């Protein structure tokens, strides 16, 4: 079971990117994108615009475990097929409602050494049936 202090929703604190990361006690889902992403020039994106949209919006989900300050993330689904077999490993620091994650390995070679700062999203209550984690299953 993961460290309960990480469970919840977090927003990326960054001048250049936006992002949301959601943690349950065993799973995570993260989406990040550049703040200055180009919109398509028309109602429908051109092939080049569609590729650029995909490359500038990173999405990853899977399972994770925290041991001490080390977080290890195993990807179940992500937008970077070339990194699918690489777990993400890094150091977590949580101070109040701020979490910092320093990537040691995994992700892509350009992410090693990167530091991400997240701010906890306040809870708004539990009076909706949608609260929780949902896994897509085939019929």
Language-model region placement:
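Lipid interaction determinants
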Residues: 1-139
